[in-house]
Amino acid sequence: MHQDNQPTFFFFDYETWGTNPAKDRPSQFAGVRTDENFNIIGEPLVMYCQLPADYLPSPEAALITGITPQKAMQEGLSEPEFIAKIHAELSKPKTTSLGYNSIRFDDEVTRYTCYRNFIDPYAWSWQNGNSRWDLLDVLRACHALRPEGVEWPENEHGFTSFKLEHLSVKNGIEHSNAHDAMADVIATIEMAKKVKAAQPKLFDYFFSMRHKRKLNELVDIVNMTPLMHVSGMLGRECQYTSWIVPVAWHPTNNNAVITIDLAKDPQPILELSTEELHERLYTKREDLGDLLPVPVKLVHLNKCPILAPAKTLTAENAENIGIDRQKCLDNLALLRQHPEIREKLIGLFSIERQFEKSDDVDTQLYDGFFSPADRAAMDIIRETDPNNLAALDIEFDDKRIKPLLFRYRARNFPGTLDEQEQRRWALHCREVFESQIEEYMLNLENLVHEHESDEKKIAILKSVYRYVESLAS
């Protein structure tokens, strides 16, 4: 029997209308709570989400998930209701929320959807003894460090595939409906059970290291103490694993540590100026030609990175994944002789990268935290009857809130707009469509040609076309 005050896991997954959490919208959510041994407790939560009128859903997404815009509109909740139910689950005390690639994707979907609907985008993941985790890098670590007890599928290029549908099938887990959110959640739970049963010490260690403060204890910049690191950024050639050395804290982000990959040639760091390093670091691999890449990587301690003492990666395991231990030790000795690289790398990350500033308020989550007064005002917005939102007399400090509030009303409660607001909203929707529709329709036509022999896919594409046509009219 599960006690209410015991820690639980909440496994979850979104299906979305595109791959960019800042701009794209959720289509489906599934989540289920388990106890610490991954036994399901309570009822699964499965919901669809309605689309806003100023958004064109990706036809590719519809083909992948099989969800049509009509299904989402008919069976879905409005976005404020949808995210409120999700937030209530994620916020239950002592919850560890997790998924598969959830830190980089699903958690971002949660944050942006909370932001658009005036819910604190971050508190659910840390208040009341809560935390977040992600199984993708745990599986990568298991594969590189302790592969016994789990079956590892190969893709067509001969590399291990970490796609959830490939792993689950290879390990005898039913996963006939991949890219259905609930099927993905069940597959993730079963893979968690599998890894924990096969490699309990490894599993429990990385689970205990999901907190920033624990990871902080591993980082020793003064002595340049090497660590074992697993990350998708390290590449599949080394099975996403390497020895790294932390050299400095990021100058403006106190959650990020600047590290050097010891398996790669450190010469560019020693020889190039800060400006040259900056240019090379942000040049695509394929555009470098014969130039050596810069083996520098930021590790964000608040994103549950896989870090462990260097000895965790044994010499034998390193050899198996193609890492030359002696070369790594030589590189470490060389870097320790050049403490001046620390200032150089701090300088490298002090250079402002020229990002296009987005003028779309929906995408401005990371432009800054809201003040306590604005947070309180946003709570009032959420609790106010939609019919009374126009009459709310609150001053906001943050310039994002007013346009967010207008969009919140227009998307979810269009009946509350006065005539002038209706004209403003219609103009906004028209601008969105006119900027995208030509390219969008061309893409849709290409997909119809590509899938002309597949009746099911053609039916989905026709549904998307009809939906977009209804919006445009």
Model regions: which residues?
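Entry/capping segment at the start of metal-dependent catalytic domains
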Residues: 1-42
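Metal-dependent phosphoesterase core characteristic of DEDDh/y 3'-5' exonuclease domains
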Residues: 24-27, 33-34, 39-67, 88-200, ...
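Metal-dependent phosphoesterase signature
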Residues: 64-82
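Glycine-rich, N-terminal phosphate-binding loop and its surrounding beta-alpha-beta segment
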Residues: 76-94
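Acidic catalytic cores of enzymes that act on phosphate-bearing nucleotides/polynucleotides
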Residues: 208-288
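Long, charge-rich C-terminal accessory regions
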Residues: 251-427
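C-terminal non-catalytic accessory extensions
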Residues: 421-473
